[in-house]
Amino acid sequence: KTFELDLVSGVVSKGYNCDESVRPLMFSKVEQISSVDESVYFGGYLLNMGKCPVSIYKRDSTDKWKVVYTFPQDTINHVHTLVSDPYRDCLWIFTGDFDEASAIWKVTDNFKTVERVCCNDQKYRSCVVFALPEGLLYATDSPFSDGFIYLMNPADYSVRAIAPIDGSCIYGCQWKDKYVFSTTVEGDGRNLSKMEFLFGRKRGVGIKNDFVHMYCGNLQDGFKEIYKEKKDRMPFYTFQFGVFKFPAGLNISNSLYFQPIATNKNDLKLMELCE
């Protein structure tokens, strides 16, 4: 279920039931564009190796969501994120994970037009994306290929490598005028036996070491590592990937807050980095 917490009253809603096995990887606030209605959206996130239809959901009111678009059978595995782009007046959807399902989609006219503009390469697989005047800044989310921070040019959909990273990326945030990406310690994710899925600790080839890395920077100053922690010794899939999670939205404070998950030092603690 998807629940809502009223911060004024402290009341938790009764919840919304998505389709079977579907959950949001993250919520996206769509705003400052005329081509798609302003609201909160999420895309269906599930394993879905058979590429069953996957939907995009729009919030209408408390516990009321409606399907605004559905990817057909054999198109994608799941939705990673939706990104408002006020500079191009459109919405971008990033999907995964394998082959042509690893794709970038451009949405206009309230989902009447959904165009796949890039696909069939792990460099288009991303969960953390920022719309900038120069293009789309994002980090890749592939455990079995080298990780990079890329900038996509929306004029011709070409991508330029900005900086290498030591793993896949699922979480990130904007901190003032800089962008933060954290890497993931995880397995390959493909062709796993049941035993490997339950108890495996072999990293994907794109995961360079046992550390969760945090990178911070922008196009003007470049990116550098600002923090890291080692993954704990527990299996990836039965327990948790090693990651850093961040609060959503723009952080304009002097402190960067985050939560390490499945690390051997500060697991589940609230951490603070100061400028």
Regions picked out by a protein language model, each given a short descriptive name:
Residues 37-38, 87-89, 133-135, 176-179, ...:
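Short coil/turn segments that connect the beta-strands within blades of beta-propeller domains
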